[in-house]
């Protein structure tokens, strides 16, 4: 989804468009937008009973302008994709550079497959998502209804595979020095202060003398678990050929975990990791061929799309 935004609107250096306060403290902004959207949805439903399609379209446009106003006030006006900016910087060799360019052209230069390589032989444009959703058949392509943020953008799809396939791809990428984006349910059996993610972190069964035995599929079906947060895998500890624990880079500042890094047990990965973004060269043809399928469309409220809304 971020790739669609970059392709349409471009990029600017962070120094020229730094984060506003609300970008790092977004709870109030998200709550306000959600409240406004719910109010607008009720109004549109009421208007649909007696108004024409043209009237509804006009009302919807006005509502979207108000949402845009809220975002602009709280985050600042976004850079125009076609307006040139000036950027001065020093490269790693202390050589001075000056650039005058539009955000779209800047993004196009950075998006050149010859220029953007996170590792030798890895094209960031070819990366795709693997998911582990045991509710649905493996080796099938999945998507979520209305999951997309840009008209005519690249569709958001997932290749559903067993966890061993995901782990093997992640290990191979890490060994090549490539960090791995992943989506998980961070709220279960994790502690942000210590930076530990482990299914054995809390022994609720011992403490309360109860049994907690839902499977991963059952947790998804009941809403007990869903993708809520994205992080990055940067290292893995392997014993006797099997992963034992993973190093995770989080985005909650250096105050969380060990200077922003967490340790995730392999058991936690089995139960609460749902998505990874991988290079096709690290999976089999059987997996990449799934991308040619017509996707199974999951409903709008499905947990597999939760972290992307």
PLM feature spans:
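Residues that flank catalytic or metal-binding motifs in active/ligand-binding sites
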Residues: 2, 178, 227-229, 244, ...
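Conserved catalytic-core surface of thiol
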Residues: 234, 239, 244-309
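Structural recognition of the beta-strand scaffold that forms the well-ordered cores
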Residues: 4, 13-15, 180-183, 232, ...
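Aromatic-residue-lined binding/catalytic grooves and analogous aromatic/hydrophobic interfacial grooves
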Residues: 38-147
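Short coil/turn segments at secondary-structure boundaries
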Residues: 17-21, 83-88, 183-185
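Extracytoplasmic mature domains of secreted/periplasmic and thylakoid-lumen proteins
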Residues: 1-40
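Solvent-exposed loop/turn segments at secondary-structure junctions
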Residues: 13, 22, 187-189, 253-254
């Amino acid at each position: 989804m971020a790739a669609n935004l970059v392709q349409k609107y471009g990029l600017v250096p962070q120094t020229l468009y730094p984060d506003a306060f609300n970008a790092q403290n977004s709870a109030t902004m998200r709550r306000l937008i959600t409240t406004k959207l719910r109010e607008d949805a009720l109004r549109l439903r009421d208007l649909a009973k007696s108004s024409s399609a043209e009237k509804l379209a006009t009302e919807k446009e006005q509502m979207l302008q108000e949402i845009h106003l809220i975002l602009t006030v709280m985050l600042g006006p976004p850079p125009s994709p076609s307006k040139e900016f000036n950027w001065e910087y020093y490269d790693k060799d202390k050589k001075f550079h000056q650039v005058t360019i539009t955000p779209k052209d800047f993004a196009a230069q950075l998006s050149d497959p010859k220029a953007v390589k996170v590792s030798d032989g890895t094209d960031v444009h070819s990366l795709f998502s693997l998911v582990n959703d045991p509710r649905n058949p493996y080796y099938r392509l999945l998507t979520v209804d209305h999951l997309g943020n840009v008209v005519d953008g690249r569709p958001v799809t997932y290749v559903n595979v067993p966890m061993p396939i995901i782990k093997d791809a992640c290990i191979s990428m890490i060994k090549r020095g490539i960090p791995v984006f992943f989506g998980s349910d961070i709220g279960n059996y994790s502690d942000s202060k210590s930076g530990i993610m482990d299914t054995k972190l809390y022994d609720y069964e011992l403490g309360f003398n109860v049994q907690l035995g839902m499977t991963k599929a059952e947790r998804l079906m009941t809403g007990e678990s869903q993708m809520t947060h994205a992080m990055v895998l940067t290292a893995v500890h392997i014993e006797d050929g099997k992963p034992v624990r993973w190093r995770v880079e989080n985005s909650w500042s250096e105050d969380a975990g060990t200077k922003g890094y967490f340790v995730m047990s392999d058991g936690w990965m089995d139960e609460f990791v749902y998505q990874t973004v991988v290079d096709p060269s690290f999976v089999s043809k059987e997996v990449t061929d799934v991308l040619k399928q017509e996707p199974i469309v999951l409903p709008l409220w499905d947990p597999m799309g939760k972290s992307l809304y």
